């Protein structure tokens, strides 16, 4: 059965990075978005996914982006109205976002990444090596370019897709409790709906149901996420969201001295926390 095309995109699309997520996303884009394969380019740092790209007739370029070459590489590939889909690691999301804001390019990624080595850079204080710091850096760009092209960062599964499910869940509860409700269109609107429903905190947990071969043994830890991401983020300081209602504070906890201060961090890497 022929799949329905939900949208027609006339611009160019550039993948930055083409690991497992990229290879899984490409056929979905071609299935659900009307755009010719010759307007898609894959820009990546290694040979992974070449066969997948060839199967769909997609241009495949191996040329790792670095802080001193990204503009030269991207300039011929992207212009106003085009789309950069960032699925890479070790490439600064903030740098790519600002590049897109300056050129009118649409942007989407699954997480905010730094340049290679930032997580373990001893010249930076722990606070500056955190995901909190990466997020604050991106939020500053929103203020710097208030009327630029649309940028959606950290829209993977969680955070990202889970936000849509949470909103749908809130609407289901509202329908059962309050009757017909108007769907909120702003952040403040969703906050007001949460107050009406008596919601104070929403915690999203994941249960991994993947089964590999050979099967995981008892007491064995198996990582089913990105290996690169798992290792690099495990070396970052452990981070916790921290609300105004908290009644205690960890013995080795520290507060950030910049940004919205909605999180704290521990003075040790995440991989050491039990």
Please place each PLM-identified region on the residue numbering.
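Conserved Rossmann-fold cofactor-binding substructure of NAD(P)-dependent oxidoreductases
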Residues: 65-78
């Amino acid at each position: 059965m022929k799949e329905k095309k939900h949208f027609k995109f006339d611009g160019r699309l550039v993948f930055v990075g083409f690991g497992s997520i990229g290879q899984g996303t490409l056929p979905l884009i071609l299935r659900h978005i009307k755009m010719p394969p010759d307007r898609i380019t894959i820009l990546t740092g290694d040979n992974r996914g070449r066969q997948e790209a060839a199967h769909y007739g997609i241009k495949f370029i191996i040329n790792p982006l670095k802080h001193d070459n990204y503009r030269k590489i991207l300039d011929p590939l992207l212009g106003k109205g085009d789309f950069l889909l960032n699925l890479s690691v070790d490439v600064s999301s903030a740098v790519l976002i600002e590049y897109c804001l300056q050129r009118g390019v649409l942007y989407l990624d699954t997480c905010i990444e730094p340049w290679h080595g930032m997580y373990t850079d001893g010249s930076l204080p722990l606070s500056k090596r955190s995901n909190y710091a990466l997020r604050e850096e991106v939020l500053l760009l929103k203020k710097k370019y208030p009327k630029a092209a649309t940028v959606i960062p950290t829209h993977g599964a969680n955070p990202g897709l889970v936000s849509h499910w949470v909103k749908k869940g809130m609407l289901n509860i509202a329908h059962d409790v309050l009757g017909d409700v108007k769907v909120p269109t702003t952040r403040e609107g969703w906050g007001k709906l949460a107050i009406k429903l008596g919601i104070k905190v929403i915690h999203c947990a994941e249960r991994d149901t993947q089964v590999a071969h050979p099967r995981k043994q008892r007491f064995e830890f198996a990582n089913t996420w990105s290996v690169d991401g798992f290792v690099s983020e495990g070396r970052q300081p452990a981070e916790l969201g921290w609300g105004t209602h908290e009644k205690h504070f960890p013995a080795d906890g520290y507060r950030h001295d910049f940004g919205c201060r909605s999180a704290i961090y521990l003075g040790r890497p995440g991989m050491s926390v039990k």
